[in-house]
Design a protein with these regions (language model features):
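Conserved nucleotide-sensing/catalytic segment adjacent to the nucleotide-binding pocket
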Residues: 1, 7-11
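A glycine-rich beta-strand to alpha-helix segment
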Residues: 268, 272-296
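Acidic, Mg2+-coordinating active-site environments of NTP-dependent enzymes
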Residues: 11, 17-172, 194, 198-201, ...
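C-terminal helical cap/extension that packs against the catalytic core
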Residues: 177, 201-204, 210-276
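Switch II (G3) loop of P-loop NTPases
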Residues: 1-3, 173-179
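Glycine/threonine-rich flexible loop motifs
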Residues: 29-36, 185, 213-217, 289-291
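Glycine-rich phosphate/pyrophosphate-binding beta-alpha loops
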Residues: 154-157, 177-187
């Protein structure tokens, strides 16, 4: 969705029984003045949910109350999920690492249970909570296999990790190059910072976040503060808008500005050493994903 009316048009065709709004952020924001306008555009899905249908909302989102009030007027069944808001129907209570997986303890409509998940990344946890909330409409969640989420494979370009062999070096490539917006980039950076490595360094290659319109400069600059508070070693950028990010990070974290795709190859070839990690994040239209996909064949 990048403009008012798109969700209204599509949801009138579908006439869904269950709708989900995961979050409100500055993705595809070029045609909106502010986040509230985006929230109202997304609320179009509530207006077209069938009578006596259900709406699933993120209780941690800043526009939860707005969407809830619209759903009340539509007389829909409202279900919520969250990590911070403990009034949510389905909420995370705790998460604890056990060997190579994490035990997520969850309250589901006042019933306490748990599931094993592969990582403790917040965006992953929120997606799981949203999924469980939808499932709870149709079945008894307490009877689900505790390892049901362990088989989930991260889609290509959405944070999948590849071990590649290049120039006699073992490198770890975290591919986030399918898309980029302020919220997903923040999540990816914080997830990258959480990864514990015994050897090697962490490098970050960023491309432009596109379709942000007049919000672009401010939102790119805001990423600098997030990066400065991480243990990521060096930042490299390619693009015009992402220069606002590069100019906002501390001097010690600055790698360099890349001007073409061949310099991306040179970065991987010359700057990375054995056991180093490189995370790549950019909007799909930048074309950086094509370069990264070529390296993922070097396993």
């Amino acid at each position: 969705m990048d403009k008012k009316g798109e969700i209204d048009y599509l949801s009138k065709i579908v006439k869904q029984d269950v709708s989900v709004i995961t979050n409100i952020n500055y993705a595809h924001a070029k045609n909106f003045k502010n986040l509230r306008q985006i929230a109202l555009a997304k609320s179009e899905i509530i207006n077209n949910t069938r009578v006596n249908g259900s709406i699933v909302l993120n209780a941690d989102d800043d526009f939860f109350a707005l969407h809830k009030n619209i759903a009340i007027k539509r007389k829909l069944k409202i279900l919520s999920f969250g990590i911070v808001n403990q009034n949510a129907n389905i909420k995370l209570i705790s998460i604890k690492q056990i060997s190579n997986k994490f035990k997520a303890t969850i309250i589901i409509n006042n019933f306490k249970t748990y599931f094993f998940i592969s990582n403790n990344f917040q965006n992953n946890i929120l997606n799981i909570l949203a999924t469980l909330t939808v499932l709870s409409i149709f079945l008894d969640i307490s009877k689900l296999n505790k390892n049901i989420f362990m088989g989930f494979k991260t889609p290509n370009g959405r944070g999948d990790i590849s071990k590649i062999k290049f120039n006699n070096k073992n490198l770890y490539l975290i591919d986030e190059s399918y898309n980029s917006n302020p919220l997903s980039l923040k999540s990816a950076i914080l997830n990258f910072d959480k990864i514990k490595i015994k050897k090697g360094k962490k490098y970050l290659l960023l491309g432009d976040m596109l379709e942000l319109g007049k919000h672009s400069k401010r939102l790119h600059q805001s990423i600098g503060k997030i990066i400065n508070n991480t243990k990521i070693d060096k930042i490299f950028v390619k693009g015009s808008e992402v220069l606002f990010t590069y100019n906002s990070i501390s001097k010690k974290k600055k790698g360099r500005v890349l001007n073409n795709n061949s310099q991306i190859i040179d970065l991987i070839k010359n700057d990375l050493n054995n056991n180093d990690y490189l995370m790549v994040k950019a909007s799909n239209a930048t074309g950086i994903n094509k370069i990264i996909n070529s390296f993922k064949g070097s396993k």
